[in-house]
């Protein structure tokens, strides 16, 4: 299916977050609130107070560290441990797909380009790659991006990293969008990072600012932003997390990540007034203090945190 035809079919299902014509290219008249270099304020607010109230309780209960940042569409920022390093795990896949979209905008890649899956691509948890390999069928870059975000397919993510130009090129992209992090490994090794380390980890504040910049800033064309939103909304492995208690008539697009001692998510949530909030939530335990209760309940911890903060969005 051609990219434009796909977008036309999905456009009406998406939240409206842009100003100007949605399909007229990269440099449209977006409001100042939506620029990637917007001024983030740290004014005290009810949401900030709520984070400071509830997150230490969860941390103490499970001997965990929780990093969370929420940025409203007007730039107001609320955060807990926002400048501490947390494992990114598979949340980074949303940024990998975003880099692909940027290269498409620059006409350096084509989403319709077909790739042959090799046996060496079939690393741990690569269901989509395995399907195409078993059927001896080529897969498009668009399908690889979809698999990477909606099913967190590891092999797809690694193939896309290769198309980008490897970790060096991807880290340059992360630097340019202000993510303030370094990815040192691809899948599955990137999941072995720990809280406080400085590779394969991110700080919630710059990570969330970068997410906002990709979705409503002027880094990507409006077509690419719509495509990214579509993939995030169609995430198929996140129902038990922030989606679980999402209020009726709200919308969410997200990308999850899981490690042996961590759970994390990045998301954009639109409330009933279609106002977007950009969120990063990282939950981890020190690798010398693992708890079986934490391992079994980290999904529900994340869901409950969402339930507690939704009244403030």
From Swiss-Prot:
Taxonomic superkingdom: Bacteria
GO molecular function, one term: beta-lactamase activity
Gene3D superfamilies: DD-peptidase/beta-lactamase superfamily (3.40.710.10)
Keyword Hydrolase assigned: yes
GO BP term, example: beta-lactam antibiotic catabolic process
Catalyzed chemical reaction(s): a beta-lactam + H2O = a substituted beta-amino acid
EC number: 3.5.2.6
Residues linked to a lipid group, N-palmitoyl cysteine type: 26
The keyword Lipoprotein belongs to this UniProt entry's keyword annotation: yes
Positions contributing to substrate binding: 255-257
InterPro entries: Beta-lactam/transpept-like, Beta-lactam_cat, Beta-lactam_class-A
Pfam families hit by this protein: Beta-lactamase2
Membrane topology designation: Lipid-anchor
Residue positions of the active site: 90 (acyl-ester intermediate)
Signal peptide location: 1-25
Compartments reported by the entry: Cell membrane
Lipid sites, type S-diacylglycerol cysteine: 26
Miscellaneous: The class A beta-lactamase family has a specific amino-acid numbering system, sometimes called Ambler or ABL numbering and often misspelt as Amber. A multiple sequence alignment was used to derive a consensus sequence and then the consensus was numbered taking into account insertions and deletions. This allows use of identical numbers, e.g. for active site residues, despite differences in protein length. UniProt always uses natural numbering of residues, hence there appear to be differences in numbering between this entry and some papers.
Record family assignment: Belongs to the class-A beta-lactamase family.
NCBIfam families for this protein: bla_class_A (NF033103)
Protein name (record): Beta-lactamase BRO-1
């Amino acid at each position: 299916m051609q990219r434009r035809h796909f977008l036309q079919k999905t456009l009406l299902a998406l939240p409206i977050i842009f100003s100007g014509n949605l399909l007229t290219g990269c440099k449209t008249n977006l409001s100042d609130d939506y620029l990637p270099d917007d001024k983030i304020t740290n004014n005290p607010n009810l949401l900030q107070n709520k984070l400071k109230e509830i997150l230490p309780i969860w941390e103490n209960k499970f001997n965990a560290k929780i990093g969370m940042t929420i940025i409203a569409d007007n730039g107001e920022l609320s955060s807990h441990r926002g400048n501490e390093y947390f494992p990114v795990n598979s949340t980074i896949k949303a940024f990998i797909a975003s880099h692909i979209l940027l290269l498409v905008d620059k006409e350096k890649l084509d989403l319709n380009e077909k790739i042959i899956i090799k046996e060496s691509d079939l690393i741990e948890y690569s269901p989509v790659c395995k399907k195409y390999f078993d059927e001896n069928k080529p897969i498009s870059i668009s399908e690889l991006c979809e698999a990477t975000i909606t099913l967190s397919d590891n092999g797809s993510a690694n193939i896309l990293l290769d198309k980008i130009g490897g970790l060096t090129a991807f880290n340059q992209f992360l630097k340019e969008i202000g993510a303030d992090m370094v990815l040192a490994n691809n899948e599955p090794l990137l999941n072995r990072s720990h809280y406080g380390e400085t590779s394969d980890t991110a700080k919630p504040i710059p990570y969330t600012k970068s997410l906002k910049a990709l979705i409503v800033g002027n880094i990507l064309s409006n077509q690419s932003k719509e495509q990214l939103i579509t993939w995030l909304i169609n995430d198929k492995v996140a129902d038990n997390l922030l989606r679980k208690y999402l209020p009726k008539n709200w919308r969410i697009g997200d990308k999850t990540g899981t490690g042996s001692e961590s759970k994390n998510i990045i998301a954009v949530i639109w409330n009933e007034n279609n106002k977007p909030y950009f969120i990063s939530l990282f939950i981890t335990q020190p690798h010398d203090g693992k708890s079986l209760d934490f391992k079994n309940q980290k999904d529900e911890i994340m869901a409950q945190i969402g339930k507690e903060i939704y009244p403030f969005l």
